[in-house]
Amino acid sequence: MITAQEVEEKLKRGPFHQWLGLKVLAVDEGSIEIEATWREEWVVNPDRKYTHGGILAALVDLTADWALVSKTGRGVPTIDMRVDYHRAAMPGNLV
C-alpha cells in the first residue's frame, strides 16, 4: 500500500497541487485525508469571505483519485463529477 509520504511527494510534483498547499494527513486502503492550506486567493466574495466552489471541487476530485490509488495502486481519470454544496467553506485550512 502507498504511504502518506509517497502520496505527498507525488502530489507536490504538480504546480497546481503545490499552489493548493496540500498535506497528506492519513492514508489507508481505499481512503485518504488531505489538507489544503488556506489562501486568500480562494475567496470568491470579499464581503462574505467564502471559498470558490472550484477549489472545493478540485479537492474532491484529487482526494477521490488518491483514495482509488490507495486501494488499487493506480489512478484513473475523472470522467464525470458532480458536487452538491451544503454550505459555504469559510477561511481556514480545508480537510
What positions do the PLM features span?
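Terminal targeting signals and extreme-terminal segments of soluble enzymes
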Residues: M1-V95
